[in-house]
């Protein structure tokens, strides 16, 4: 993506704020005009007061200066606060947009994109964009108008000397353009390494138990040291180029001032210019050169912002793999059956499911068993469209799930998985997460049905207990029962249980199993289980091996077949 394309897209984000921007730009123009007037007043200060001894002008000049500075101060505050608000609003919009876009992606997006990278895009990259947007809107626009008015003053006073000033601009532009390309490249590398640091932090902190279990603290510290050392090296390289610009611009400016003093001083000596005109010109030129120098100083910030914007837009340009059709309708309440019609699915070239045909009547508890990697979880992930099938179709009451909105589909499905996901919030809010609005009584009923009410009430803060990240303050069985309470409160007619008890000890499993039995009542349930003892009472059991259903029947029927199910059963 070129700079022009990035700027064009950023421009479209700014358009909604055009009215406050116009107000701020008007204030900037007035401030710039007053800055030009300040420079011009140096001429009258020297010529009329010091040379001509004009007493009247001496009396009114201080009042004029006070009026100019007061007006500039008021207008500066006006445009600065407006532009700060606009800049922050644009960044807020970007954060909301990228956050919403990320959550519209399918599961494969999260499998392929490291968490630290996504965090870096939302926080670090957008923050750098904010700096660039604020710099461009506030500083560059202000400096642009200031330079225009000061150049007008310069040409008005002495066009010959003004031409010398114009020789500076091409010289000053060379390092700005040259270093701009370097900054862009280094900024991209810096943000890539920053994302790697974020990834490493996320992995090691979330996996702290494994790090400690294998005594790998020193190893991880050394690995992190290497990563931050790489980031340090790139950052310092960026800093060297950035800092080098300032003295370079000072040297160029020094030559320009020396030339103007030599030419302008000669004109004063031979009488073709007054001292006031010369010093006013010099003041205007030095004042105008400051914004030119600032362009070189902020060039690094702008290039970092453009590189960050490119990465943010790259995320925003990723189309979700699963989107509602334009003509998609809401799924009617589930009543009859869920059917798989010749369903196949592959990850790349690897076939995971092959020609699955299955009908699950409403109210049935279907257990899905089989060796690891056989396709059990993939089969259930197709129902809520976490992934999309590639061949065949899945229908609910005869309606293809691809013809309905994903929200209406998922609203009729509840899940309890082996990996219990709880948020760093209170127990109450974690249970209520499954329903937009619910009463305290509904939350308590769900907790009671999930066999969680007793231990919740024993906690010092009860339902207001903060769980910590991932529910770290609870045991595995307690976390799972909170998850079951959440599913109960959602009251969805379709239930998916994916290894819901496999990570629990016997006592915890017993409590969770009771809660699951309550949850499964009057629901159509898909149960994935390795512990076959937990699914003996299932209405039907299907054995999935290498992506195919190889056996189907009740527990007793499958044992009589003396096939795959019996092998699995005997292994336990």
Swiss-Prot record:
UniProt key word Aminoacyl-tRNA synthetase: no
Annotated transmembrane regions: 14-34, 55-75, 148-168, 249-269, 272-292
Record-level GO cellular component terms: plasma membrane
Subcellular location: Cell inner membrane
Disulfide bond positions: none
Keyword presence, Oxidoreductase: no
Quaternary structure and interacting proteins, as annotated: Homodimer.
PANTHER family: ATP-BINDING CASSETTE SUB-FAMILY B MEMBER 10, MITOCHONDRIAL (PTHR43394:SF1), ATP-DEPENDENT PERMEASE MDL1, MITOCHONDRIAL (PTHR43394)
Record remark: domains: In MsbA the ATP-binding domain (NBD) and the transmembrane domain (TMD) are fused.
Protein name: ATP-dependent lipid A-core flippase
Organism: Desulfotalea psychrophila (strain LSv54 / DSM 12343)
Source lineage: Bacteria, Pseudomonadati, Thermodesulfobacteriota, Desulfobulbia, Desulfobulbales
Primary gene name: msbA
């Amino acid at each position: 993506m070129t700079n022009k394309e990035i700027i064009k897209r950023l421009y479209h984000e700014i358009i909604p704020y055009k009215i406050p921007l116009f107000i701020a730009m008007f204030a900037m123009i007035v401030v710039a005009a007053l800055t030009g007037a300040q420079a011009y007043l140096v001429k009258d200060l020297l010529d009329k007061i010091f040379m001509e001894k004009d007493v009247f002008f001496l009396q009114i000049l201080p009042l004029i200066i006070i009026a100019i500075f007061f007006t500039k101060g008021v207008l500066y505050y006006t445009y600065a606060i407006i532009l700060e608000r606009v800049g922050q609003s644009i960044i807020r919009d970007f954060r909301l947009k990228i956050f919403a876009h990320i959550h519209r992606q399918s599961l494969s997006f999260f499998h392929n994109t490291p968490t630290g990278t996504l965090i870096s895009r939302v926080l670090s990259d957008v923050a750098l964009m904010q700096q660039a947007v604020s710099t461009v809107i506030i500083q560059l626009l202000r400096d642009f108008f200031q330079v225009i008015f000061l150049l007008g003053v310069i040409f008005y006073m002495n066009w010959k000397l003004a031409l010398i000033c114009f020789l500076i601009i091409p010289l000053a532009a060379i390092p700005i353009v040259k270093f701009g390309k370097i900054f862009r490249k280094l900024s991209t590398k810096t943000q890539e390494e920053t994302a790697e640091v974020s990834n490493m932090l996320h992995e090691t902190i979330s996996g702290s138990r494994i790090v400690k279990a294998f005594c790998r603290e020193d190893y991880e510290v050394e690995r992190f040291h290497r990563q931050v050392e790489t980031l340090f090296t790139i950052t310092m390289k960026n800093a060297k180029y950035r800092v080098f610009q300032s003295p370079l611009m000072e040297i160029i400016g020094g030559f320009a001032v020396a030339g103007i003093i030599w030419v302008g001083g000669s004109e004063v000596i031979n009488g073709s210019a007054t001292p006031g005109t010369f010093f006013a010109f010099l003041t205007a030129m030095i004042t105008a050169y400051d914004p030119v120098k600032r362009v070189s100083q902020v060039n690094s910030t702008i290039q970092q912002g453009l590189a960050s914007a490119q990465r943010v837009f790259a995320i925003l340009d990723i189309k979700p793999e699963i989107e509602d059709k334009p003509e998609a309708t809401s799924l009617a309440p589930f009543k009859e059956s869920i059917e798989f019609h010749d369903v196949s699915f592959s990850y790349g070239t690897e076939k995971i499911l092959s020609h699955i045909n299955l009908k699950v009547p409403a109210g049935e508890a279907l257990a899905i068993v089989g060796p690891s990697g056989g396709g059990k979880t993939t089969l259930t992930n197709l129902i809520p469209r976490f992934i999309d099938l590639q061949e065949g179709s899945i229908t609910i009451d005869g309606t293809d799930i691809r013809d309905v909105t994903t929200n209406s589909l998922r609203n009729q499905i509840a899940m309890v998985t082996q990996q219990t996901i709880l948020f760093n919030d209170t127990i109450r809010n974690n249970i209520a997460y499954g329903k937009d609005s619910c009463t305290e009584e509904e939350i308590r009923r769900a907790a009671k049905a999930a066999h969680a009410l007793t231990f919740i009430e024993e906690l010092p803060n009860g339902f207001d207990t903060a769980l910590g990240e991932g529910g770290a303050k609870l045991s595995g069985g307690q976390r799972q029962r909170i998850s079951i309470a959440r599913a109960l409160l959602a009251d969805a007619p379709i239930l998916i249980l994916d290894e819901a008890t496999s990570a629990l000890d016997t006592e915890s499993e017993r409590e969770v199993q009771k809660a699951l039995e309550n949850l499964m009542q009057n629901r159509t349930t898909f149960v994935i289980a390795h512990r076959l003892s937990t699914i003996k009472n299932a209405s039907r059991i299907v054995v999935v091996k290498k992506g195919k259903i190889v056996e189907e029947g009740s527990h007793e029927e499958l044992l009589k077949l003396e096939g795959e199910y019996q092998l699995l059963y005997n292994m336990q």
